[in-house]
Amino acid sequence: MEPVIPEGALSQSTKDFLAGVSGGVAQVLVGQPFDCVKVRLQSQSNVSPIYNNALDCVKKISKNEGLAAFYKGTVLPLLGIGFCVSIQFTTFEYCKRFFSRDGTPVTMPQYYVSGAISGLANSFLVGPVEHVRIRLQIQTGKNVLYHGPWDCIKKISSQYGLSGIMKGYNPTAAREAHGLGMYFLAYEALVKNTMAKHHLTDRSQTPGWKLCVFGAGAGYAMWLAAYPFDIVKSKIQTDGFLSKATYKNSWQCAKGIYTKAGLRGFYRGFVPVLVRAAPANAVTFYVYETVSQHIRHL
């Protein structure tokens, strides 16, 4: 069992929150270009696609829109996803402390449950943040509907209210719960295995490069489990509103994807996600663990 660190002026939850924000900001800066490619591939038509594959997508975006296009809509996720990741880690660490309150080690199923709870808590914020980001990412050319994240929020909320902003929430919640359950389970299993194998008494003794590898592995575990939900979410969040919507609900969307493209349709755009998963999640956990160690005695 890892030693209990006495709290200083800051509560443990506050420390988890600050470390999570740091990890989230790092994740956005590294992962945003990959996410842009993923969304373009996911949201394009199955009948007449604009991009043949991920590399073709990168080439066409670079040529037609410039390199800055890969960071479209970054301001909101930089703030929003940073906050989202802090919610993930704060909730997860709180659940870990709850499950180990009587001194017993946290079990693997409890790690999954803790991750799933953190995903549900996070989904209320990440849903609208990603909705706005996606609306901005799919805009091409000069005649755009939304001029930045705040303009996007204003226009959607004024026309369609809160339900418009929260469009695609159900598949987002499913993705976050199952995905983060697997995410934290994989990471903690790798850390625990290393600590036991090398007789480490504290996770701060784990080398930084291993934290990066474990973070990358956790990212793969999450996306392998959650990607089909993400496909449905992206389809709905790039769909029209109310009477202009192609899909009435998530189930109809999933059936439509399967009818047109089979199981392969649920993994469209998966290559840039796999490429992104390693660096984005490696840096997330490395920054989170590093900041946690630096502020643990505050």
From Swiss-Prot:
Transmembrane regions listed in the UniProt entry: 17-37, 67-87, 112-132, 172-192, 212-232, 266-287
GO molecular function terms listed in the Swiss-Prot or TrEMBL record: glycine transmembrane transporter activity; L-glutamate transmembrane transporter activity
InterPro entries referenced in this protein's UniProt entry, alphabetically: Mit_carrier, Mitochondrial_Carrier, Mitochondrial_sb/sol_carrier, Mt_carrier_dom_sf
Annotated GO CC locations: mitochondrial inner membrane; mitochondrion
UniProt keyword list: Membrane, Mitochondrion, Mitochondrion inner membrane, Repeat, Transmembrane, Transmembrane helix, Transport
Membrane topology label: Multi-pass membrane protein
Domain of life: Eukaryota
UniProt Solcar repeat ranges: 14-98, 106-193, 206-294
SUPFAM superfamilies per record: Mitochondrial carrier (SSF103506)
One GO biological process term: mitochondrial L-ornithine transmembrane transport
Record-stated family: Belongs to the mitochondrial carrier (TC 2.A.29) family.
Protein purpose: Acts as a glutamate and glycine mitochondrial transmembrane transporter.
Name of the protein in its database record: Glutamate/glycine mitochondrial carrier ymc1
Gene: ymc1
